[in-house]
From Swiss-Prot:
Organism of derivation: Yersinia enterocolitica serotype O:8 / biotype 1B (strain NCTC 13174 / 8081)
Keywords linked to the UniProt accession: Dipeptidase, Hydrolase, Manganese, Metal-binding, Metalloprotease, Protease
Gene3D superfamilies listed in its UniProt record: Creatinase/methionine aminopeptidase superfamily, Creatinase/prolidase N-terminal domain
Binding site for Mn(2+) 1: 257, 345, 390, 429
Manner of cofactor binding, per the entry note: Binds 2 manganese ions per subunit.
Binding site for Mn(2+) 2: 246, 257, 429
Role played: Splits dipeptides with a prolyl residue in the C-terminal position.
Protein name: Xaa-Pro dipeptidase
Length: 449
């Protein structure tokens, strides 16, 4: 098995080749990639938690240090100015010494403002990549060379194709996230509150709330019907019926994004609890069934439609919708209030990774179908793409309400829906890798139930 260092060197060669290509295409000499800067809270003397520029951490696994700069030209050894001030107020990161550092020319940057004197004088044909545009202007970058769209389009498009190093990092992120999910499940079974379940997850993964790749969704009962629920109640509800957790982790800047849904057990199990448990089981089977059909050369949008067909089957099988064919359910949009979000999204340096709608390296955009406006990917599946597959089935009153008085109202089993609404909803999410002749399910490979 190749070491992470050798995988990183191959990864760096790939990035260098992409850089040569994009520089030649746009008649540039180099890219100056900024890790970012701390952002001061308005009328305060504190800063918001630092979030690194994704294009920066694509090159080096430095995710917690602002004011770093990377100069790349595709030919010479990438040069990293690493921010290392003399500071007794804050902890200062030492100059890195790790598996990747021999491949990078690392220089200390003691004062953030010194970068102006350290950069090459001639930078008229250099593009700045980062979010501190005022800083770039102060360094003399012209407006057209600050985050030029054609350059970003190119870089974003090829980020969809993960190197072996990136895949190795993402598998490690999966391991951390799975450990957290198992700990959270145990906390749920012991009757803990949402707040305490989240703490159990963070403890098991060794993360703080500011470290996770996205805000953890830890939802009990009807809170599971709020797609991005992040409130975290401090007290458990009087009756715990269900639990949805959507939480991830990072490794060297690469994300995992996993979701599971569970039903609470009890000696006197209500019929509604049995119904909800059966829905979880069957949605899990449909999710796995869809994953088995994934293959190269097919647009992700097609699988989104197929998932709605599978949702229609569940609605009919569980008598949630009756007296209408599965085909008509999909055609008339009856599945949409039950599954209002898309099948999934690209995953990588960002949770909702770039280029989900991009059809080529020049930025051609293909929007989501009007019927499924929240789908986050319209790409044709190709080897080395990493995506989430996360179908759901929810009982959301604001989405169901228009159907109560609509022409198809008689087909909805409103009594059964009312009994299931207190459980909120279901989402099951795995992270998969597209290979030439197979699909790798990184999540199930780690036995996350």
């Amino acid at each position: 098995m190749e070491t992470l260092a050798s995988l990183y060197n191959e990864h760096l060669s790939t990035l260098q080749q992409r850089t040569r290509d994009v520089l030649e295409r746009h008649q540039l000499d180099a890219l100056l990639i900024h890790s970012g800067e701390l952002q001061r809270i308005f009328l305060d003397d504190r800063d918001y938690p630092f979030k690194v520029n994704a294009q920066f951490k694509a090159w080096v696994p430095v995710t917690q240090v602002p004011n770093c700069w990377l100069w790349v030209d595709g030919v010479n050894t990438p040069k990293l100015w690493f921010y290392s001030p003399v500071d007794y107020w804050h902890c200062v990161e030492p100059l890195p010494d790790s598996f990747w550092t021999k491949a990078i020319d690392i220089q200390p940057l003691v004062n953030a403002n010194d970068i102006a004197q350290l950069l090459p004088v001639q930078r008229e044909r250099v593009a700045y990549i980062g979010y501190a545009q005022q800083r770039a202007q102060a360094l003399g970058f012209s407006a057209e060379n600050i985050n030029p769209k054609p350059v970003l389009d190119y870089l974003h498009f090829y980020r969809s194709y993960k190197t072996d190093y990136e895949l190795a990092c993402m598998r490690e992120a999966q391991k951390t996230a799975v450990a957290g999910h198992n700990a959270a499940h145990e906390a749920f079974l012991s009757g803990m509150s949402e707040f305490d379940i989240n703490l159990a997850y963070l403890m098991a993964t060794g993360q703080r709330d500011t470290d996770v790749p996205y805000d953890n969704i830890v939802a009990l009962n009807e809170h599971s019907a709020v797609l991005h629920y992040t409130t975290l109640q401090h007290q458990p509800p009087a009756e715990i019926r269900s639990f949805l957790i959507d939480a991830g982790a990072e490794y060297n800047g690469y994300a995992a994004d996993l979701t599971r849904t569970y039903v609470a057990g009890s000696k006197n199990t209500a019929d509604s609890k049995n119904d909800f448990a059966a829905l979880i089981k069957d949605l899990n089977n449909e999710q796995l069934g869809l994953i088995k059909t994934l293959k190269c050369g097919v647009n992700y949008t097609e699988y989104n439609v197929q998932m709605h067909q599978r949702i229609a089957k569940l609605l009919r099988t569980h008598n949630l919708v009756t007296g209408i064919s599965e085909e008509a359910m999909v055609e008339q949009g009856i599945t949409c209030p039950f599954l209002p979000h898309g099948l999934g999204h690209p995953l990588g340096l960002q949770v909702h990774d770039t280029a989900g709608f991009m059809q080529d390296d020049k930025g051609a955009h293909l929007s989501a179908p009007s019927k499924y406006p929240y789908l986050r990917c319209t790409r044709i599946l190709q080897p080395r793409m990493v995506l989430t597959i996360e179908p759901g089935l929810y009982f959301i009153e604001s989405l169901l309400a228009p159907w109560r008085s609509g022409e198809f109202s008689q087909h909805f089993n409103w009594d059964l829906i009312e009994t299931l609404k207190p459980y909120g909803g279901i989402r099951i999410e795995d992270n998969i890798v597209i290979h030439e002749n197979r699909v790798e399910n990184m999540t199930r490979d780690l036995k996350l139930a």
